[in-house]
C-alpha cells in the first residue's frame, strides 16, 4: 500500500528550506512588492537618453538593481508556491510577481534598440569607456549582435509575426497533449492496462515483455495515424526559423540558434563526427543488453527494460548526506564546507508533502542562498539527485560569490556540467568501494544508460535536426515520408545489426518536443561529455584539475561558455573531450562485461 503523504505542517522543519534570509515573512514580501512599481517606472526616465557612456552606465546600474529586487520577490513567491501548490495565498503571490516580471520586461524594452541604433564607431567608443567598465562584456556581446538587429520598424514588423511563427509549436503540443488517444492493451497476465502519453515510458520499463510490446504498438499506432500532421507542424517550425534567420542575416537557422552563446558550428559537427566514430561501442552495448535480457531478438520495446533488478537498499537522508560529502571529497575541503553549510543552514527542502511540487531543482537568486527542492524517497536515485542538485547549487553559490549580479548567471550551455560532475563522482566513489558483482553491475548499467541516453541518443537527435533543417534550406520537401526515412536511417546506424528495427520506430521523431526549440538537444551531449572529461581529470590529475574546475565554477556568465570550459581544461572546438568521454564509456562496458561473466 502506498504511503499517505503528510501535510507540510506535520513534517520536521529542520528538513524544510529556510526562506527567511530572503524575506522574514510573507508580510515583508508584500511590502517589498508594493514598492516595486515605482522602481520599475523610474527606468522610463532613461528613454531617449542612452547616447553616451555615463548615461548608459547609470541606466545599467539602475536596471540591474531593479532586476535584483524582482528576482528576489519572484524566487520567494515561486518557492512558497512549490511548498504546497494548493495554497491559494502562494498562488496569488506567484501570479502577482509574474506580472511584475512582464511589466519590467516592457519597461526595459526601449534600451537595447536604442543603444544598437547608435553608429558603430560611437558604440565601440562607449564599450571601451571606463564609465561602463563593469558591463564591458555584456556590451561587447550586444555589439556582436548588431549585424543581426533590424531597424526599429523591421523589428516591430517581425515581432508582429511572433504568434504566427510559434503556431507550429502550439499545434504540436495541442495535438500531442489533447488529441492523441491510445488503445488499452493486455499485459502478460491478460489484465487490461491503459496507455497514455505520461505512462508510456514507465510501461516500457516494465519487466513484463508482453506489456512492453503491446504498449509500444499501441503508442506508435496513434503517431502513425497523425504522422502527416506532425510532419506539417515540424516543417512549419523549421520554415519559420529559416525565415527569421534569413531576415536577420544569418547563414542558417543553426547559425542563428547557436549565436546567442557564441558557439561555432564546428562544435556541433565535431560532436556528431566524434560520436559517429564511437558508434561501434554503442553496438557493443546493444549486444550486452540483448545478452543480459536473454532474448533471441532485441526490439525497441526492450530498450528501457531493466537489465538488473532494483537494489533493495534503502538510504536514510542522513546517510545520503554523508555519501554526497564523500563523493565530492576530491574537490577539496572548501567544496565540502559549502555542502555542509547547505545542510546546516537549511538550503534544502527534503521530503515530499501533500501539494508539494514533484521532481527536484536548484533555485534561489543573487541575494539569497541557493535552494534545493527534493522529494527524497530513500532510493539510490534519490541520493544521486541530491548529488546532482548540489552540483548546480555550488556552481550558483560560487558564481554569486565571485561575480557581480550582471555576470552571476551561467548559460544553459554549461548548466548541466557541475551537476553531472557530482553524479559521476558519486558513482565512481560507489564503484570504488563495491565488491558485490550484482550491485556493481547495477551501478555500471546506470552509468552506461546515462551515456546511451545523454550522449548517443541526443547526438542522434542532433544529427536528425541538422539534416531536417538543411533539407528545408536546400528547398527539398520535408514531408512525413522524408522525415520517417531520415529517422529510420539514423536509428539503424546508431543501434546496429543486433537491434530489430521495428517499423514503428520511424515515427519516434514526432514525439520529441525539443525539436521545436531548434538546435538545443546537442547541449545535453556536449554537457555530459564535458562533465565526464572533468570528473576523470579531477580523479586522475588531482589538485591542478580541481583548481581549474573551481575557477570555472566561479565564472558565472562573465565569459562565453566555450572560453569558460577551456579555462576548466576542456576545449569543445576539438574532438578530444567527446573522444575521452566515449573512451570512458568503452572502459565501463569492459567492466560490465567482465562483471556479468562472474555472475554466469
Model-based region annotation:
Residues 313-315, 348-368:
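Catalytic zinc-binding patch centered on the HExxH motif and its immediate surroundings
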Residues 313-315, 365-387:
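Short pre-active-site segment immediately N-terminal to the catalytic Zn-binding motif
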Residues 9-11, 20, 24, 111, ...:
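C-terminal, non-catalytic "cap/extension" segments appended to globular domains
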Residues 326-337, 360-363, 392, 396-404, ...:
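Conserved helix-loop functional segments at active or binding sites
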Residues 1-310, 595-600:
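A well-structured
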Residues 249, 377-397, 419, 424, ...:
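Active-site recognition of the HExxH zinc-binding catalytic motif
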Residues 292-330, 336, 370, 395, ...:
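Long, K/E/R/D-enriched contiguous segments that form extended
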Residues 410-438, 447-449, 453, 527:
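Post-HExxH zinc-binding segment in Zn-dependent metallohydrolases
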Amino acid at each position: 500500500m502506498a504511503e499517505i503523504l503528510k501535510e507540510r505542517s506535520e513534517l520536521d522543519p529542520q528538513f524544510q528550506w529556510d526562506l527567511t534570509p530572503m524575506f522574514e515573512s510573507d508580510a515583508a514580501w508584500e511590502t517589498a512588492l508594493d514598492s516595486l512599481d515605482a522602481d520599475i517606472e523610474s527606468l522610463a526616465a532613461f528613454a531617449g537618453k542612452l547616447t553616451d557612456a555615463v548615461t548608459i552606465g547609470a541606466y545599467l546600474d539602475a536596471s540591474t538593481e531593479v532586476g535584483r529586487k524582482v528576482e528576489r520577490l519572484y524566487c520567494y513567491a515561486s518557492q512558497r508556491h512549490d511548498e504546497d501548490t494548493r495554497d491559494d495565498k502562494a498562488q496569488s503571490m506567484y501570479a502577482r510577481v509574474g506580472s511584475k516580471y512582464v511589466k519590467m520586461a516592457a519597461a526595459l524594452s526601449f534600451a537595447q534598440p536604442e543603444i544598437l541604433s547608435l553608429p558603430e564607431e560611437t558604440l565601440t567608443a562607449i564599450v571601451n569607456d571606463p564609465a561602463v567598465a563593469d558591463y564591458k562584456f555584456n556590451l561587447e556581446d550586444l555589439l556582436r549582435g548588431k549585424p543581426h538587429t533590424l531597424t526599429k520598424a523591421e523589428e516591430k514588423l517581425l515581432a508582429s509575426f511572433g504568434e504566427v511563427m510559434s503556431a507550429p509549436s502550439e499545434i504540436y503540443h495541442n495535438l500531442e497533449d489533447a488529441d492523441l488517444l491510445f488503445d488499452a492493451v493486455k499485459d502478460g497476465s491478460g489484465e487490461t492496462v491503459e496507455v497514455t502519453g505520461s505512462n508510456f515510458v514507465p510501461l516500457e520499463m516494465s519487466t513484463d515483455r508482453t506489456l512492453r510490446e503491446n504498449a509500444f504498438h499501441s503508442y506508435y499506432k496513434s503517431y502513425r495515424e497523425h504522422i502527416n500532421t506532425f510532419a506539417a507542424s515540424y516543417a512549419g517550425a523549421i520554415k519559420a526559423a529559416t525565415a527569421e534567420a534569413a531576415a536577420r542575416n544569418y547563414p542558417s537557422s543553426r547559425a542563428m540558434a547557436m549565436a546567442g552563446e557564441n558557439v561555432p558550428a564546428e562544435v556541433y559537427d565535431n560532436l556528431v563526427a566524434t560520436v559517429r566514430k564511437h558508434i561501434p561501442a554503442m553496438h557493443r552495448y546493444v549486444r550486452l543488453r540483448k545478452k543480459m535480457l536473454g532474448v533471441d531478438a532485441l526490439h525497441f520495446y526492450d530498450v528501457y527494460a531493466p537489465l538488473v533488478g532494483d537494489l533493495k537498499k534503502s538510504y536514510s537522508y542522513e546517510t545520503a548526506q554523508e555519501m554526497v560529502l564523500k563523493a565530492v571529497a576530491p574537490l577539496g575541503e572548501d567544496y565540502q564546507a559549502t555542502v555542509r553549510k547547505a545542510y546546516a543552514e537549511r538550503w534544502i527542502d527534503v521530503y515530499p508533502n501533500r501539494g508539494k511540487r514533484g521532481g527536484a531543482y536548484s533555485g534561489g537568486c543573487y541575494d539569497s542562498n541557493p535552494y534545493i527542492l527534493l522529494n527524497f524517497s530513500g532510493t539510490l536515485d534519490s541520493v544521486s539527485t541530491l548529488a546532482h542538485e548540489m552540483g548546480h547549487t555550488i556552481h550558483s553559490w560560487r558564481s554569486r560569490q565571485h561575480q557581480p549580479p550582471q555576470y552571476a548567471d551561467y548559460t544553459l550551455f554549461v548548466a548541466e556540467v557541475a551537476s553531472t560532475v557530482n553524479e559521476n563522482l558519486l558513482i565512481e566513489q560507489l564503484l570504488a568501494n563495491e565488491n558485490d558483482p550484482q550491485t556493481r553491475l547495477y551501478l555500471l548499467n546506470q552509468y552506461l544508460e546515462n551515456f546511451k541516453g545523454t550522449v548517443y541518443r541526443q547526438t542522434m537527435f542532433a544529427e536528425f535536426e541538422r539534416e531536417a533543417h538543411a533539407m528545408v534550406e536546400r528547398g527539398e520537401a520535408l514531408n512525413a515520408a522524408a522525415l520517417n526515412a531520415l529517422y529510420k536511417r539514423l536509428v539503424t546506424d546508431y543501434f546496429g545489426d543486433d537491434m530489430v528495427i521495428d517499423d514503428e520506430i520511424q515515427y519516434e521523431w514526432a514525439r520529441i518536443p525539443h525539436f521545436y526549440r531548434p538546435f538545443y538537444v546537442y547541449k545535453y551531449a556536449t554537457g555530459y561529455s564535458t562533465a565526464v572529461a572533468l570528473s576523470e581529470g579531477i580523479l586522475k590529475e588531482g589538485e591542478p584539475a580541481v583548481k581549474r574546475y573551481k575557477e570555472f565554477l566561479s565564472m558565472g556568465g562573465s565569459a562565453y561558455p566555450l572560453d569558460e570550459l577551456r579555462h576548466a581544461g576542456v576545449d569543445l572546438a576539438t574532438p578530444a573531450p567527446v573522444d575521452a568521454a566515449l573512451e570512458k564509456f568503452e572502459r565501463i562496458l569492459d567492466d560490465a562485461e567482465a562483471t556479468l561473466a562472474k555472475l554466469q
